[in-house]
Swiss-Prot record:
In contrast to classical FBPases, is resistant to inhibition by lithium. Phosphatase with a broad specificity. Can dephosphorylate a variety of substrates including phosphorylated sugars like fructose-6-phosphate (F6P). Is able to function in vivo as a fructose-1,6-bisphosphatase (FBPase) and to maintain gluconeogenesis when the classical FBPase GlpX is absent. Shows negligible phosphoglycerate mutase activity. Has no phosphatase activity against 3-phosphoglycerate, 2,3-bisphosphoglycerate, or hydrophobic substrates such as alpha-napthyl phosphate. This is Acid phosphatase. The active site is at 13 (tele-phosphohistidine intermediate), 85 (proton donor/acceptor). NCBIfam families: PRK13462.1. GO terms for biological process: gluconeogenesis; regulation of phosphorelay signal transduction system. Keywords: Carbohydrate metabolism, Gluconeogenesis, Hydrolase. InterPro entries: His_Pase_superF_clade-1, His_PPase_superfam, PGM_Phosphatase. Its EC number is 3.1.3.2, 3.1.3.11. The gene is gpm2. Homodimer.
């Protein structure tokens, strides 16, 4: 079996108090809520049903991702800042409506963040994450435990779209995305797989 027979899975961390409010959470350490902890456990049950092939688990260094991995019953093989969330810089802790009070058309996918990461920087980091996954996929499945925006960035670059198209993918808390190949073409096979109900976000 080779790289085209294996999968890249992405697991977003469970719910936090900031994620429920839509606050941009990059490097700030926030704990999972009780709901988030349950979500992580349910995600672990789902992963157990996916018949993964000797998966290597690579995790962001943030506490919320490490706790999600532990609650999901995963053994983390590598912790790396490569999978950290978008650095929101001056916008850390703010919601999109708050940011748009001063920059009406702002979208992280097209504008980036002052004093944080630009779109180009996240694009390059996502490409590096995809390359890392492909290195391991020659012999096994790969599971990234990461964050909402960065997981969407990886998915976008996996399917070789411009990073701005990441705005079109949803990644609810503790949800799973699965990337793979069909006839040699990189594809997104599954998105938003959860073991818990998720409301549809408005606007």
């Amino acid at each position: 079996m080779g790289v085209r027979n294996h999968r890249l899975l992405l697991l977003r961390h469970g719910e936090t108090a900031w994620s429920t409010l839509g606050r941009h959470t990059g490097g700030t350490e926030v704990e999972l809520t009780d709901t988030g902890r349950t979500q992580a456990e349910l995600a672990g049950q789902l992963l157990g049903e996916l018949e993964l092939d000797d998966p290597i688990v690579i995790c962001s260094p943030r506490r919320r991702t490490l706790d999600t991995a532990k609650l999901a019953g995963l053994t983390v093989n590598e912790v790396t800042g490569l999978l950290a969330e978008w650095d929101y810089g001056s916008y850390e802790g703010l919601t999109t409506p708050q940011i748009r009070e001063s920059e009406p058309d702002w979208l992280v996918w097209t504008h980036g963040c002052p004093a944080g990461e630009s779109v180009a920087q996240v694009n390059d980091r996502a490409d590096s994450a995809v390359a890392l996954a492909l290195e391991h996929m020659s012999s096994r499945d790969v599971l990234f435990v990461s964050h909402g925006h960065f997981s969407r960035a990886v998915i976008t670059r996996w399917v070789q779209l411009p990073l701005a198209e990441g705005s079109r993918f949803a990644m609810p808390t503790a949800s799973i995305g699965i990337c793979g190949f069909e006839h040699g073409v990189r594809q997104l096979a599954v998105l938003g797989l959860t073991g818990h109900p998720q409301p549809i976000a408005a606007g």
